[in-house]
């Protein structure tokens, strides 16, 4: 009897002390779950590393593209300086002074603007009004589905009408004070919108005294026009006397001493309207299409 009890106790002890407990059947082996878990963990870690590397490469690509796009052309001054100068009225007595010059074989009519304020207009104003001194086109447009669409950024009195940064040249206006420049940043457009100003974009011809060949999408020879700025910050409107390529026109502007220039379509007018500082008017403004205009007043 005592022997049988002792045998039973030993059997119970053996069962309790046995540290191998079969749970998953005969195929289960100690440590197999940990090994599979480690493999899965390594796979997830490798996938995360590859994903992070891909995101870094993709981010670097888009950052590089953004920097190249925004800084493709030289700048004669930063956007912050242009914004600051938009608070400064144009110097001099209100009026337009005309002279003819030649550079690189290109004959040009150069209209110097002084003491004037710029305004957007969608129709030709009465330029017999003594307050009107000069009129030119501003942005371009296309007709799509029977509707007029302005090309490039176009902001009028703080209202965004069109958005596109590809055309790197621009004219910005705040309270009549105008500045031209070359930049694809949205910084100036944001400032103009917040301050109820106006802005349009055009093809860049000259940026920081260098050509902007990637913007020269208009081929052939026709008479050309542009707004340009010199080192002193004075603003001019230039038109060629004879048909020229954009390359030849830009080279002539640089040779003459302009540091920035933006293109204006429409070509030369046979006898363009302008008003001298003494109030004497000349010529007339002709435009048979509904272009957006810049009107300069005192």
Protein language model features and the residues they cover:
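Structural motif
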Residues: 132-135, 169-170, 177-180, 203-204, ...
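Short beta-strand-initiation
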Residues: 93, 106, 166-168, 200, ...
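Conserved, well-ordered active-site substructure
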Residues: 145-164, 217-221, 229, 234-260, ...
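Active-site-adjacent helix-turn-beta-strand microarchitecture at beta-sheet edges
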Residues: 136-137, 142-216
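Short, surface-exposed beta-strand/loop micro-motifs that present aromatic residues
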Residues: 98, 225-228
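Zymogen propeptides
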Residues: 11-164
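Short, Lys/Arg-enriched N-terminal segments with co-localized hydrophobic residues
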Residues: 1-9
């Amino acid at each position: 009897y005592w022997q049988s009890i002792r045998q039973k106790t030993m059997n119970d002890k053996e069962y309790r002390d046995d540290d191998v407990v079969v749970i998953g059947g005969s195929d289960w082996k100690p440590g197999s779950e940990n090994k599979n878990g480690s493999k899965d963990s390594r796979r997830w870690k490798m996938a995360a590393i590859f994903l992070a590397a891909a995101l870094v490469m993709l981010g670097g690509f888009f950052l590089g593209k953004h920097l190249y796009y925004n800084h493709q052309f030289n700048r004669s001054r930063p956007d912050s300086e242009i914004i600051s100068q938009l608070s400064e009225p144009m110097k001099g007595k209100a009026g337009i002074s005309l002279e003819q010059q030649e550079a690189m074989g290109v004959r040009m009519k150069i209209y110097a603007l002084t003491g004037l304020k710029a305004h957007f207009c969608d129709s030709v104003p009465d330029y017999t009004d003594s307050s009107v001194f000069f009129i030119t086109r501003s942005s371009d447009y296309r007709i799509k589905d029977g509707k007029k669409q302005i090309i490039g950024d176009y902001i009028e009195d703080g209202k965004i009408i069109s958005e596109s940064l590809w055309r790197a040249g621009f004219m910005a206006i705040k309270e009549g004070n105008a500045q031209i420049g070359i930049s694809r940043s949205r910084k100036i457009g944001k400032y103009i919108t917040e301050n109820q100003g106006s802005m349009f974009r055009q093809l860049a011809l000259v940026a920081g005294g260098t050509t902007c060949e990637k913007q020269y999408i208009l081929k052939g020879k026709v008479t050309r026009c542009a707004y340009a700025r010199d080192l002193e910050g004075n603003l001019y409107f230039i038109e060629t006397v004879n048909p020229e390529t954009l390359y030849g026109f830009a080279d002539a502007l640089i040779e003459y001493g302009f540091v920035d220039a933006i293109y204006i379509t429409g070509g030369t007018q046979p006898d363009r309207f302008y008003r001298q500082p003494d109030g004497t008017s000349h010529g007339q403004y002709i435009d048979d299409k509904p272009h957006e205009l810049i009107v300069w007043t005192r």
